[in-house]
């Protein structure tokens, strides 16, 4: 019979690897030096450290003249938050080549160029909020007058789009529609447009794809526009956008997929990369779990099984709120 002590104090093999270690505050003076320890801290800090390494590798390749086409996907709540300005900066600086987002990721960017969203609280009486006409996104408040103001701009924009479609004899794709929104912002809005993702995508000719363009306030405004005018001519084409998006992946020498959140943007990007044998680099930032079989929670390794991420790709998934980790990730890679 094995002695209890021998069971508890079982001999082990020695292993090689990175020692777990955190910053000793007497030895660090700036935040950047603290972040340098992340890959050695363990848990999700290590995943963030790995994401920094992957994105830096992509940036180094691009700086040396190698082609790595960067796809960025994000859900609407990312734009609801202060991450909007980080993404706009990335587009402005030429760090992103292709964007996929939801309808909210488009319209909230435009709305914020009109009036800001307001920091609120998670714990409020939501029935009272409704009575006051204040919408809540977590602890971010959006007074309904933002959407009233948005409609004032969208109706003349729709009229412009309708005339464009009549002149060219075919509908705009969703990415063309968003490009024209950027042009419209450039013409109609003031300095605040310079914090806008759509504006800089227009200026830098970065396509923004939105396969579910009507699933939000833009869809609401289209409904009002069509019902009030009896219009059945204004159409947004999503079918031809899938060709454009897929070909942007197919024609790239290498691709990197950076995805904040899950849902449609995540799948649109990795599915486009399926047609080229998978993306070469992938960084996921998510709070979704894989246990329910959802696409949002599917880890990169599951994407490998579908051919959407290459088996030898550099990839990592960070399980965290993107508002916590994305600013650190961008700062460390870009600065």
From Swiss-Prot:
Keywords: Hypusine biosynthesis, NAD, Transferase
UniProt family annotation: Belongs to the deoxyhypusine synthase family.
Listed PANTHER family: DEOXYHYPUSINE SYNTHASE (PTHR11703:SF0)
Reported cofactor(s): NAD(+)
Source taxonomy: Archaea, Methanobacteriati, Methanobacteriota, Thermococci, Thermococcales
GO function terms (MF aspect): deoxyhypusine synthase activity
Stored Pfam families: DS
Gene3D superfamilies to which the protein is assigned, alphabetical: Deoxyhypusine synthase (3.40.910.10)
NCBIfam families, alphabetized: dhys (TIGR00321), PRK03971.1 (NF003052)
Enzyme's top EC category: transferase
InterPro entries in the record: Deoxyhypus_synthase_arc, Deoxyhypusine_synthase, Deoxyhypusine_synthase_sf, DHS-like_NAD/FAD-binding_dom
Function per UniProt: Catalyzes the NAD-dependent oxidative cleavage of spermidine and the subsequent transfer of the butylamine moiety of spermidine to the epsilon-amino group of a specific lysine residue of the eIF-5A precursor protein to form the intermediate deoxyhypusine residue.
Entry's EC annotation: 2.5.1.46
Protein name, as recorded: Probable deoxyhypusine synthase
Catalytic machinery residues: 308 (nucleophile)
Catalytic activity: [eIF5A protein]-L-lysine + spermidine = [eIF5A protein]-deoxyhypusine + propane-1,3-diamine
Organism: Thermococcus onnurineus (strain NA1)
Coiled coil: none
Gene Ontology CC annotations of this record: cytoplasm
Functional pathway: Protein modification; eIF5A hypusination
């Amino acid at each position: 019979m094995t002695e209890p002590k021998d069971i508890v104090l079982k001999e082990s093999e020695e292993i090689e690897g990175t020692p777990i270690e955190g910053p000793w505050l007497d030895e660090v003076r700036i935040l950047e030096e603290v972040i340098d320890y992340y890959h050695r801290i363990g848990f999700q800090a290590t995943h963030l450290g790995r994401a920094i390494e992957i994105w830096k590798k992509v940036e180094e390749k691009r700086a040396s003249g190698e082609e790595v086409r960067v796809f960025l996907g994000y859900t609407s709540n990312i734009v609801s938050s202060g991450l909007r300005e980080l993404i706009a900066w990335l587009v402005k600086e030429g760090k992103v080549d292709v964007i996929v987002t939801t309808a909210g990721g488009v319209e909230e960017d435009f709305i914020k160029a009109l009036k800001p969203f307001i920091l609120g609280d998670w714990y409020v009486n939501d029935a009272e909020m409704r009575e006051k006409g204040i919408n809540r996104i977590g602890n971010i408040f959006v007074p309904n007058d933002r959407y009233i103001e948005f409609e004032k701009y969208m109706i003349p924009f729709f009229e412009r789009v309708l005339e464009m479609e009549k002149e060219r004899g075919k509908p705009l794709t969703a990415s063309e529609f968003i490009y024209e929104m950027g042009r419209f912002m450039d013409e109609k809005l003031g300095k605040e447009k310079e914090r806008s993702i759509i504006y800089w995508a227009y200026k830098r000719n970065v396509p923004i794809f939105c396969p579910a363009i009507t699933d939000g306030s833009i869809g609401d405004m289209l409904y009002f526009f069509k019902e009030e005018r009896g219009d059945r001519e204004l159409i947004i084409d999503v079918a031809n956008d899938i060709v454009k998006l897929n070909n942007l992946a197919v024609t790239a020498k290498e691709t990197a997929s950076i995805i904040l959140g899950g849902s449609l943007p995540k799948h649109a990007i990795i599915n486009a990369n399926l047609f080229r044998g998978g993306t070469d680099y992938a960084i996921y930032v998510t709070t979704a779990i894989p246990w329910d079989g959802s696409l949002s929670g599917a880890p990169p390794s599951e994407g490998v099984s579908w051919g959407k991420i290459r088996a030898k790709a550099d990839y990592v998934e960070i399980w965290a709120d993107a508002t916590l980790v994305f600013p650190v990730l961008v700062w460390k890679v870009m600065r």
